[in-house]
C-alpha cells in the first residue's frame, strides 16, 4: 500500500488539467469582447485575433478576402470580429479542428464572413442551444442578417454569416 505511483499519476493528471484550464481562461479573458485596433482594417484585426486565439496550438489558419474590401462602420466590424472569434473558439474547443479558413467576402450590399474547419462537425439543430451560437444568432438578427450552417458530425463545418451593409455605411 506504500506504492506512490497511483498518487503521482493523479498529480500529473491534475497538473495537466490545471495547465489546460489556465490556457483556456487566458484565451477567454483576452477575447471576451474584441475591439478594432486603431489604424487596422478588419482583415488585420482578424489576423491579430487569430494569432492570439490560436497561439500555442498546432491549428493552421488561412485568412483571405473576396471582392473589394471597403470601410465598414466600427460597430459592424467589431460584431464580425466577435462572431469570428466565437466560431474559431468553437472549432478549437469543441471541433478539435486542425485547420480553420476565414474568408471575408465583400459584395455590393452585404458582407459575408465564412468560417470553415476540418473538425468533428456537429448537428446544426443541436448547436442552437449553446450560448455562443445563440448569442451570434441574436446579434445577426439585430443587424438584419442571417447565418447558414453546413455541418455534419465527422465532416467539419462551414458557417456563413451574411450582414447587410447598406444600413451601416460610414
List the predicted regions and their residue ranges.
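Coiled-coil dimerization/phosphotransfer module
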Residues: 1-170
Amino acid at each position: 500500500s506504500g506504492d506512490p505511483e497511483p498518487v503521482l499519476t493523479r498529480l500529473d493528471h491534475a497538473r495537466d488539467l490545471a495547465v489546460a484550464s489556465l490556457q483556456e481562461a487566458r484565451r477567454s479573458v483576452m477575447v471576451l469582447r474584441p475591439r478594432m485596433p486603431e489604424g487596422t482594417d478588419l482583415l488585420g484585426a482578424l489576423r491579430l485575433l487569430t494569432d492570439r486565439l490560436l497561439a500555442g496550438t498546432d491549428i493552421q489558419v488561412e485568412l483571405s478576402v473576396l471582392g473589394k474590401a471597403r470601410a465598414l462602420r466600427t460597430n459592424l466590424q467589431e460584431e464580425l470580429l466577435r462572431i469570428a472569434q466565437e466560431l474559431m473558439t468553437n472549432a478549437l474547443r469543441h471541433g478539435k479542428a486542425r485547420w480553420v479558413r476565414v474568408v471575408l467576402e465583400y459584395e455590393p450590399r452585404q458582407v459575408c464572413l465564412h468560417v470553415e474547419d476540418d473538425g468533428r462537425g456537429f448537428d446544426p439543430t443541436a448547436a442552437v442551444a449553446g450560448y455562443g451560437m445563440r448569442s451570434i444568432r441574436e446579434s445577426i438578427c439585430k443587424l438584419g442578417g442571417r447565418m447558414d450552417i453546413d455541418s455534419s458530425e465527422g465532416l467539419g463545418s462551414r458557417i456563413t454569416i451574411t450582414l447587410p451593409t447598406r444600413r451601416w455605411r460610414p
